[in-house]
A protein has these predicted regions:
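Bacterial N-terminal signal peptides that target proteins for export
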Residues: 1-10
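Glycine-centered loop-to-beta-strand initiation motif
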Residues: 69-80
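Short beta-strand/loop motifs in extracellular/secreted proteins, especially
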Residues: 44-48, 89
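Short, surface-exposed loop/turn segments at beta-strand-coil junctions that are enriched for proline
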Residues: 81-85
Length: 140
């Protein structure tokens, strides 16, 4: 009987595991990453700050969150999905320290990407960059 309970428990865990992983990745509405195109690798250890534009005072930005890119150059946990996140946001990527660590001078001390969030869809706002250029797009 004990053996049967153990097998049943393992089956239940294996069945529920994919749902818990999906729930964790979808619990945040905004993610980002940086790809260093000069190396073809993720940019690890870059500080990023998220701001939201104050709708009543359009010249003021409110800091919402900060993070540092992981080994894959990603931050996946900006903006919890349980809130209404409609608004205009800015991701500020502090890229200069990343390039200085590699012995490179960058023309961009930081990169600011401004975008709008509407509804409950997930937004992935990555940048691809080198010390002398960058590009952005809405990913998924």
């Amino acid at each position: 009987m004990t053996q049967l309970i153990k097998k049943f428990s393992v089956i239940i865990i294996l069945f529920l595991l994919p749902f818990s992983i999906y729930a964790q990745t979808e619990s945040h509405q905004l993610s980002t990453h940086i790809l260093d195109i000069s190396k073809g690798e993720p940019a690890q250890g870059v500080d990023i700050t998220l701001y939201k534009l104050n709708p009543s005072t359009p010249s003021q930005w409110k800091q919402i969150a900060t993070g540092k890119t992981d080994i894959n150059g990603r931050i996946s946990n900006f903006l919890p999905s349980i809130e209404d996140n409609t608004g205009i946001y800015m991701l500020k990527f502090y890229t200069e320290p990343y390039f200085l660590k590699q012995g490179l001078k960058s023309i961009y001390p930081f990169v600011e990407v401004i975008f709008r969030i509407e509804g409950k869809k997930h937004y992935h706002i990555p940048i691809t960059m080198s010390a002398n250029g960058y590009s952005t797009y809405r990913g998924n």
